[in-house]
Amino acid sequence: MTEALARSATASREAEELATRPKIVGASVKRTEDPRLLTGRGAYVDDRKVPGVLHVAFRRSDHSHALIKSIDCSAARKADGVVAVFTAEDMAEVNAVFATSRMKNYYATPITGLATEKVRYVGEPVVGVIAQSRYLAEDALELLDIAYEPLAVVIDPEEAAKPSSALLHEEAGTNVLCSREFKTGDAEAAIASAAVRVSERFRFHRKTPTAMENRTYLAEYEPGRDELTLYTSSQVPGIIRDALSDALDMPGSQLRVIAPDVGGGFGGKASLYPEEIFVAFAARRLGRAVKWTSDRMEDLAATSQGFDQIVDAELALDAEGNAVALKAEVIGDVGAYSIYPWTAVIEPVQVVSFLPGPYKIANYLGRVRGVATSKPPTGPYRGVGRPTSTFVTERLMDMAAQRLGKDPVALRLRNMIQPGEFPHRIGSGIIWDQCAFTECLNAACEKVDYQNLRARQAEARAAGRWFGIGVACYAELTGIGSRISVAPGMPINTGTETAKITVVSTGAVTAAFGVTAMGQGLETTLAQVVAEHLGGRVKDIRVIQGDSAAVPNATGSYASRSAVLAGGAATLAAKEVKEKMIRAASHLLETGPEDLVVEDGKVSVVGTDRALTFRQLARAVYLEMGRIPADKREELASTKTYDPVFGTSATAAHIAVVEIDPDTYEIKLERFVVAEDCGRL
């Protein structure tokens, strides 16, 4: 009973403090990372200077699909400045990495540092040359003699899915690396009896993430302790550490992966790459630091790509415009390999998962196949499935509105999940927790004066002007928790994040996370969260991120999760450290915990001028023995893992007003309005 009352009092005090003190989270503050980044003092992988570092250049496949008959490295090994030349045979002791999944009808392809036995796409690394400079390594590439036996090229995913197609991975017995079906109700029967049906085939072409900083890896090896540190321009250093531990048979305690400043990622740096495996292997084999920085052509050819899908979709409605069924067949071109850790499933399955969007559709049938082709692997890239699914569903809504003679906004509002209907499970099983679908669309319409805008459009059309109004709404699952992340059965848990917050003996606060900053301002955001819940000052909090050794478990930054999950972990850890500080201060100031408040970097007795700064309190805890009894002394630190379990939903409505000159085809964007549910600001 006493403990319960104490917890209640603590919760009430925290709520009162948050309500009365100046807001930190959501306040406009100067970004703490900006001074060094804007003055050119950022520290990226390529900026790291290591005496005697060796440089790698890769000879890449110039065939889309071919057997490797022979590789003659003799001339290259004799070239000036060349230290080593490695092929797949030299890496026999390195284990292949597999992006496993418990999902039915899924095949995991091996990921290796260099192509083994055959190549499956143009740009796949075949030989690694290591020399005293990148120039010398590049020169030696021309001395390699590789004999190939060309095989049938597999380009079209629909053809590749046929049993008669040439196989990229013979052991799989098929090019269909994954297939899945989502079904609610009887979509086919509902479509057959519907008053109105609209359908279309949509073709989405490949995109390549093109970050300002190319992919770069630097491996440093300490032979005496068999310790390897990989500096990588990765979004996911914790994931890379764990994968390399398996590949190299090295305990995690001897492997450290650090992502310093990263110049953008967009999903393209969120996966394990063959070059990372190779650089780590080479550094350990040679006992030297080894570095590879991709040039722009390599980055475009060998970084994972996205959005390569064919979608056949049909929407059925009754005569009043109520959507009754949605059906879709999706073929995802996943490239030559199932990428680690996300698997070939990541993009095509999410297209099908999110197709119902913000609409109530009782009957849904979505089928998807991920098909291997002779192209670079696909992986996460900006939105992962949502741009495709949103485009398809919104286009079908426009087609249906035209067929029914209804206003596109009115049709959407009729079919949207309404404010009192949350949480809502859509046909694929995704749950929208609390969304503002109708509120966002109404707000956007109000902002553009939608009814008058339609009147203007009618006048313009009557005058022969091409005046268009585009409307689109979306829903996105962000900050996903463990319940969602385990569904695909991947080899990692992407649904949690860990924070470690420590107040050291000087009173300084360090907050360590497993996420990685790529320009999104996480250093400032997380410092704000810690400051608010700890009672410190933003300027006094040092944020450590992108280091696999900083926290026990980490995955990284991707999928609109970093602020949500790392911020949640920061909140839990900061609150626990604050409780410890209050207990210590209560003893030192000889007052009850309920009379103490923590803010602005000090613990104060309410209504008095009695206070302890963080520095004074930390010295009493750590250095001034006897001030706090040994049995009551607590380390001012906490490590907490946050799991939102399901996740949260982000929603928005977009309205574009565009006019095209019918003579010159000049495009004029008159207005673009977005109404978004941004949560707490």
Predicted regions and their residues:
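Internal maturation/activation junctions in enzymes
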Residues: 593, 602, 607-650
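Accessory "access/gating" subregions that flank catalytic or transport cores
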Residues: 191-198, 203-208, 413-502
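Phosphate/diphosphate-binding loops
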Residues: 125, 132-133, 287-335, 451, ...
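Flexible, low-hydrophobicity surface segments
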Residues: 1-173, 177, 197, 285, ...
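Glycine-rich loop/linker segments at domain edges
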Residues: 27, 33-36, 101-104, 109, ...
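Alpha-helical support elements that line or immediately flank enzyme active sites
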Residues: 58-92, 127-148, 217-286, 341-354, ...
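Beta-strand segments within the central parallel beta-sheet cores of soluble alpha/beta enzyme folds
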Residues: 254-260, 287-297, 324-329, 361, ...
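Intrinsic disorder at enzyme termini
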Residues: 1-41, 428, 438-462, 478, ...
